[in-house]
């Protein structure tokens, strides 16, 4: 019996050795070089797909009016460095006010969404409470509805609350309405809170920690990566929103950066027909660059902190 087992073991060792030899042969210098070339080509291809739209935007923004109006093909090279296009879109004096209102709406949307979704996620992460399954089913059912289907109800709430008057400060609350709550963000926080080992909560309560203190001092810091993810998604949604501000601010492009971009580059009066109004694409591209500039600045200032927070994992071992 022992001899037969030894024979089977030797055969197993020989098979493993052959497999190892094949692996070593497969990792020859030619295969490694081909793999490196393939990865480089793929990375360059997708890198160009990301960079090319920004390059095209910058080229068009620096092109003169004559070339933009007469060209019949895509502009891949500018006819000069017409930086005066940026000065022309800033002449109306509405850019800074639109940036300020947009920033205020974005910050307020992040704060309110974190407040509601963190509370929702933590509540549904608790083990048992009455009607938990019923409320969770109702919240998940909301995910079936598209965002456009909710606009009518949201607009009705804003009108009843009198938050749709652009000349009043309450318009800020009206602009933040669609971004205050999110079932998807609440689902993310629920999953993050449920991933915390139960022994941490048990140890905290043994040490005399109350429920609120445990939530603020232990549970919430441990879902920091989810907090940053929700904040980033909310910031992009609030900053790039167009349809909702268009409903509330039809004639006030100075209160939203995207409406300000839409209003730029039209050479004509309101009384003229569509054929008489010229659209200067270079001015629109210049305005678009100025619109995304604040987000780029914020990202480059906090990129290390954002990447560190998103990539971090909470320590689940009590020290």
UniProtKB/Swiss-Prot annotation:
It comes from the Bacteria. GO terms for biological process: transmembrane transport. It is found in: Cell membrane. Signal peptide: none annotated. The chain crosses the membrane at residues 41-61, 98-118, 134-154, 169-189, 229-249, 282-302. InterPro entries: MetI-like (IPR000515), MetI-like_sf (IPR035906). Its main location: membrane. It is a multi-pass membrane protein. Disulfide bonds: none annotated. Residues 99-302 form the ABC transmembrane type-1 domain. Keywords: Cell membrane, Membrane, Transmembrane, Transmembrane helix, Transport. Probably part of a binding-protein-dependent transport system. Probably responsible for the translocation of the substrate across the membrane. Belongs to the binding-protein-dependent transport system permease family. MalFG subfamily. This is Probable ABC transporter permease protein MG189 homolog. It comes from Mycoplasma pneumoniae (strain ATCC 29342 / M129 / Subtype 1) (Mycoplasmoides pneumoniae).
